[in-house]
Amino acid sequence: MIRNPRLRNREQANNRHLIDPYPVHTLKRVDQPTTRINEAEVFRQHEQTSGFYRAGRGDFGEHMQQEYRRFVPKYPLSGAMVSMAGALADLVDEPVGMGAAGMPDSAVPKNMSWAPMGQVAEKKAPFTDNPEKMARHIKETAYFLRADLVGICELPVYAIYSHQKQDGKPIHLNHKYAIAILIDQDWHTSRQTSGNDWISNSMSFLAYSTSGFIACMLADYIRRLGYPARAHHAMNYQVAVPPILLWAGLGEMCRIGDIVLNPFLGPRFKAAIVTTDLPLAIDKPIDFGLQDFCAKCKKCATECPSGSISDKDKVMYHGYEKWPVDVDKCTKMRIGNKQGSGCGVCIKVCPWNKPNTLFHRSISWTMRKLPFARRFGVWGDDLLGYGKPDYNHKWWLDLETINGDLQVPNSSKNR
């Protein structure tokens, strides 16, 4: 059995002469996202309004501010991942030497020519004037770099943040296209975790750091082809990710707050974006019945340990029709979790969080095509025991950094 499903999926896709490792060609394409968006009411948001930034600023009190500073590095594996992701922060578009990325200048071989990350080639490369061919090529390149799913859209103006999070300066981004890169958080681990134990943050930062790594390389590659490009990842965004995922055909908005759910990965992924002026053919939004499914399911709302997710109907909020979520409660739970590192219970229990097996592909197809089957899908999910942790194959160590020392937490399942 191939442990890495991406490799298996790519092999199957190549045998069918398809680009994508999942059967995205079977999805229903529509002209508009299934989430109603009133563009007249949507405004460009300041990234400093995010729950995590406000926690770090002290808006939720001194204790939460202190926990914000340690909620990722308090677990050694997620700490290592965020350290690596932090090295990518300056590699999005600005000219940066290797030393600034964390590698001492003395470690760079003298016989190698390291082009500045932000430099755009003076001449446009051959073959880059055909949008259809370049879209296919860019997707294939992203998959070669180990992406799990890729989509392309025109960059919505309202997806661009108004100001930088770091210094509050206005953002001026005029790229035409956005390339979205999804990375699976690993079904093998997701099956075993409770969703809010000690591996939770590491699953997130596995996908954050990997998608960011790919985005930085892809953006640099596009610049070498003669077109401006910027990577956007967890350590350095200039765009909001959800609207881009909607327009790039990578999912629909779900009940879990501002999360986009993919029909093949469920909510079990993180994304990075590359914006560019390279001419690209775009994808269209998709409709796989998720709005109807989430209206009936409500499992994430029932299981949410902080009560952040609503079981009520949708509301219009900042121009989007969406299910409401209490961002403050969610942020406090993820940062202040005393039983683990972070929280992803909503991802864990979601009926769309499944492996890519023939059985589960069949169930997914049925729920996409037959509305009456969706309620039975939720019932069957509970009947088969999905959403519960399987510690029989648990591989990670339960450890917590307290005052600089690694200790076994009281909530450890290692005992």
Label each region the model flagged.
Residues 75, 82, 244, 360, ...:
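Low-complexity, intrinsically disordered regions enriched in charged/polar residues
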Residues 2-32, 312-415:
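Flanking helices and flexible, charged tails adjoining ferredoxin-like Fe-S electron-transfer domains
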Residues 139, 144-356, 360-367:
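Catalytic cores of enzyme domains
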Residues 1-190, 195-197:
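Non-catalytic, usually N-terminal nucleic-acid engagement modules in DNA/RNA processing proteins
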Residues 130, 134, 209, 213-214, ...:
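Intrinsic-disorder/low-complexity, polar/charged segments
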